[in-house]
């Protein structure tokens, strides 16, 4: 899912800029294949629901609760 989101934004740098994080933070999400829930919510809002937070978090939901 994170790869689709990055493609939508055009680059890791642009995604990071939109979220107010570093590109290295985004790179870590790619490496871990996990996005923190609060960032997933932010992505859902920024993309007007194009990507749903619940789908971004996926099977890791219980881990974050």
Locations of the language-model features?
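The DNA-recognition helices of helix-turn-helix-type DNA-binding domains
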Residues: 33
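Short, charged recognition helix plus adjacent turn
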Residues: 3-4, 8, 13, 17, ...
């Amino acid at each position: 899912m994170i790869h689709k989101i990055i493609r939508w934004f055009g680059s890791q740098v642009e995604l990071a800029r939109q979220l107010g994080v570093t590109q290295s933070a985004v790179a870590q999400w790619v490496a871990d294949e996990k996005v923190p829930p609060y960032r997933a919510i932010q992505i859902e809002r920024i993309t007007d629901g194009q990507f749903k937070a619940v789908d971004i978090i996926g099977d890791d939901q219980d881990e974050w609760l």
